């Protein structure tokens, strides 16, 4: 990344971390897959596993990395059986596949909601600065980004989420959920049906093709419960469904 020394220091104080490698350059201000995958390839020698969260950024970078290393990526693991074997959901989360890799380097994305956050360690490990490789591929360039500003918590980090589906009937009714969310300090989500109906933008979408969440409390209002939606919120601690 760029100007990421504070992140490196925080990682260095995390439990079970042995060392931290940092590549700090203005070239990595924005997470362009071509640039970051080149860095990962340059430092991959000597490592058996390279992991990233199954976020938008991770899903963009890791497939390219696996192609450059000529290995098979293992996507969205939810459990580690041993150093070669992992569990990952299939069929929209209705089944769990156990996958064993014989590749010398395992390239893996992790479904973060399946694991507890790492704790702080009792000491800090060493941080090693890595010289960034020369960027010779200019096929992609950063054009711009637009930050969505919300007064409520972000979906993937919220402790309470209230989501609406097609049963809300229209966008005006959907705004009722926003008022409840303000009272609860909750984030607002939506099913794909609600997004496709134009009630809210796709930033709200929870499910297999949206955001994967695991809040303490998930309130579903007017949602039929399609398996694609369940795949995105089934790890919630408490689920309350309101259909009428």
For each predicted feature, which ranges?
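N-terminal glycine-rich FAD/FM-binding segment characteristic of electron-transfer flavoproteins
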Residues: 1-244
């Amino acid at each position: 990344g760029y100007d990421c020394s504070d992140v490196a220091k925080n990682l260095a104080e995390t439990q079970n971390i042995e060392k931290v490698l940092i590549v700090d350059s203005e070239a990595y201000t924005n997470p362009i897959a071509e640039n970051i995958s080149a860095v990962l390839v340059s430092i991959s020698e000597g490592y058996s596993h390279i992991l990233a969260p199954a976020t938008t950024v991770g899903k963009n970078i890791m497939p390219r990395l696996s192609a450059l290393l000529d290995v098979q990526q293992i996507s969205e693991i939810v459990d580690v059986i041993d150093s070669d074997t992992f569990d990952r959901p299939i069929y929209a989360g209705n089944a769990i596949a156990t996958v064993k890799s014989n590749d010398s380097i395992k390239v893996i994305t992790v479904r973060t909601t399946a694991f507890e956050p790492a704790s702080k360690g009792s000491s800090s490990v060493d941080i090693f600065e890595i010289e960034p490789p020369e960027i010779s591929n200019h096929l992609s360039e950063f054009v711009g980004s637009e930050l969505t500003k919300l007064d409520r918590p972000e979906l993937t980090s919220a402790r309470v989420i209230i989501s609406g589906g097609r049963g809300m009937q229209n966008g005006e009714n959907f705004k009722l959920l926003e008022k409840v969310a303000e009272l609860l300090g909750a984030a607002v989500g939506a099913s794909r049906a609600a997004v496709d109906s134009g009630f809210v933008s796709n930033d709200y979408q929870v499910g297999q093709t949206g955001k994967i969440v695991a809040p303490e409390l998930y309130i579903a209002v007017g949602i039929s419960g399609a398996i694609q939606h369940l795949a995105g919120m089934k790890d919630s601690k408490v689920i309350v469904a309101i259909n009428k």
